[in-house]
Regions:
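Class I SAM-dependent methyltransferase Rossmann-like catalytic core
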Residues: 2-64, 72-74, 78-91
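Conserved beta-strand/loop positions that form the S-adenosyl-L-methionine
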Residues: 68
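Class I S-adenosyl-L-methionine
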Residues: 221-272
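A short SAM/SAH-binding and catalytic strip from SAM-dependent methyltransferases
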Residues: 166-184
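A short acidic, Gly/Pro-enriched loop at the edge of an enzyme's catalytic core
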Residues: 157-169
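Conserved beta-strand signature within the Rossmann-like core of class I S-adenosyl-L-methionine
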Residues: 191-205
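Conserved class I S-adenosyl-L-methionine
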Residues: 202-222
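Class I SAM-dependent methyltransferase SAM/SAH-binding core
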Residues: 73-155
Length: 285
């Protein structure tokens, strides 16, 4: 099975020490100063897509949403709960919570999120190779199903295959590049009916191989033409120039986008053609 460009070393700073901690506090403490914001942009988009799916397919209640590279369940928190990314950042960098043991923070988080769950919340499945991060999201109730699996390396477990079978929507806000066609092949092989796919993808990473793969399952991929979305500031000049080099390889320019000091993402939405005809992307977003 080919896996065209999945790569663990493509010019981005190494934040491995925050991706698999016992709780999200180091994650927010590190990324906050870099104005990390892509889950904020994802919140409005994923809620709009979930609403559209419920309108087009009212029999799908609750929706089944799979968040790929889910980390601590941030996208799910923003989809299913009355919170913002700013709320979460403030919470996890607050002095009051800074000294709490993880087990006490988890207990507080369970209460915090339970009081803010939206009535139309989707059933949430999270997949990430970071076992402690996924475990925390499951422990505090953000994920209904949590799988610490690396689909770039191994086939889905039987339990994950069973859970994936009823998926309505796949979301991802930054993992493409770390996961690529091999992961998406294994996801689709576990889904009798192809779901919608919404992916925020760094402009430094080509999405065409994944779009072509999705097309073979009957999904048409559209790129939102009107704008890009900031992910976060570059951590340093080395990261900045690596991004510029990657853009050049892809025939893209940084002017008006990455030249502002931020990574920028494109939004790709993949759906069956009848769903696109019923609700064009321009009306949907």
């Amino acid at each position: 099975m080919s896996n065209t460009t999945a790569n663990d070393d493509w010019g981005k700073a190494n934040f491995n020490d925050i991706y698999d901690c016992p709780d999200p506090r180091p994650y927010f403490a590190t990324l906050g100063p870099l104005e990390y914001q892509i889950p904020h942009h994802g919140q409005a988009v994923f809620r709009a897509l979930a609403h559209a799916l419920r309108c087009l397919h009212p029999d799908r209640t609750p929706l089944n949403v799979v968040d790929l590279c889910c980390s601590y369940g941030i996208n799910t928190a923003l989809l299913n709960y009355r919170v913002t990314l700013a709320d979460l950042s403030t919470r996890y960098t607050s002095h009051r919570l800074s000294a709490l043991p993880t087990r006490h923070l988890a207990a507080e988080d369970r209460t915090f999120f339970a009081a803010r769950r939206r009535p139309e919340a989707a059933t949430a499945t999270g997949i990430d190779s970071a076992a402690r991060a996924v475990g925390y999201a499951r422990a505090v109730g953000l994920l209904d199903h949590a799988f610490a699996e690396n689909l770039e390396v191994t086939e889905p477990s039987p339990a994950l295959r069973r859970t994936l079978a009823g998926t309505d929507l796949i979301t991802v806000t930054g993992g493409v590049g770390y996961v690529f066609t091999r992961t998406f092949t294994r996801l689709l092989d576990s889904m009798p009916t192809p779901p919608w796919v919404a992916a925020f993808v760094l402009r430094t990473v080509p999405y065409r191989p994944i779009a072509d793969l999705l097309a073979r399952s009957g999904l048409v991929t559209e790129k939102l033409p009107t704008r890009t979305f900031r992910q976060r500031r570059f951590a340093d000049s080395a990261e900045r120039y690596a991004a510029f080099d990657a853009l050049a390889v892809n025939g893209l320019h940084a002017a008006g986008k990455e030249a502002d000091g931020f990574y920028h993402t494109d939004l790709y939405v993949s759906r069956p053609a009848p769903d696109i005809a019923a609700l064009p992307l321009a009306r949907l977003l």
